[in-house]
Amino acid sequence: MQSMQPSTVDKLKMGAIMGSAAGLGIGFLFGGVAVLRYGPGPRGFLRTLGQYMLTSAATFGFFMSIGSVIRNEDIPLIQQSGSHWNQRLLNENANSSRIFALAMQQAKSSPRKSNEVAEC
């Protein structure tokens, strides 16, 4: 029996929550350092620190939500198309190896003089 996978909206919410939590922590650290270093300013300590934390949480949450949806979207389709690309890359690698081997054979069979200029 196959388990239910989260929907796209669930992935979006999960990414936003994780990003917001990380952003709050980073905002607390950087905001605390900024307040200690440059002073709280006219708004006071808590408002300045809170603004750092909320701005950082909103930014991290936004990008993490988008990233979590993009990262987890249609994994079976990506794997199928990936096998197509892997096969194509293997074929092109084999073709380039054959071309290189033929060029090396031709170079060995007809050596050039040292003062002859190669034409491209």
Curated annotation (Swiss-Prot):
Extracellular compartment segments: 37-49
GO CC term, one of those recorded: cytoplasm
Transmembrane annotation, as ranges: 16-36, 50-70
Membrane-topology descriptor: Multi-pass membrane protein
Keyword vocabulary terms for this entry: Membrane, Transmembrane, Transmembrane helix
Location within or outside the cell: Membrane
Topology feature Cytoplasmic, residues: 1-15, 71-120
GO biological process: protein import into mitochondrial matrix; protein insertion into mitochondrial inner membrane
Transmembrane helix among keywords: yes
Origin superkingdom: Eukaryota
Family under the similarity heading: Belongs to the MGR2 family.
Family matches, as PANTHER family: REACTIVE OXYGEN SPECIES MODULATOR 1
Function recorded in the entry: Required for cell viability in cells lacking mitochondrial DNA.
Protein name: Protein mgr2
Native species: Schizosaccharomyces pombe (strain 972 / ATCC 24843)
Lineage: Eukaryota, Fungi, Dikarya, Ascomycota, Taphrinomycotina
Gene: mgr2
